[in-house]
Amino acid sequence: MRVKIICSLLCRPVFPEISTRNILFQIFVDTPSNIGKTYTATSGKSFTVSKIDNFEYIDPIDKSVTKNQGIRIFFEDGSRIVMRLSGTGSSGATVRMYVDTYESERANQFKSAAEMLAPCIDVALQISQLPKFTGRNEPTVIT
């Protein structure tokens, strides 16, 4: 079963007004050594990077392509993280983070989204270094 954070407690953490010069997303994407790298959450659960890309949006109507929409980090267990910058405020952009994770243990599939996604979110914060760049340990909005 795939647990997605689309409309649940930890759906979409939002970190507004980020200085874009501090965002190291592209460096992460452009570093091939990140493929195969294992990150361990504070809970002890490990995630090994299987693929990283900078995704694009293809309009379903006119088929126009908008490149560099954000990064996707895929893990060997089927979990993934999507991070993208959106908009610009007077002091920077907003980082939107989407996380989904795969859980094969049936007993765990009935736990709360917050509990199930916490390890993957922990790893997303390690990779993005958002607490370092923003001075915040949690997002201002969770949808």
Segments the model singles out, each with a brief description of its role:
Residues M1-T101, E105-R106, F110-A118, D122, ...:
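Phosphate-binding and adjacent anionic-ligand microenvironments
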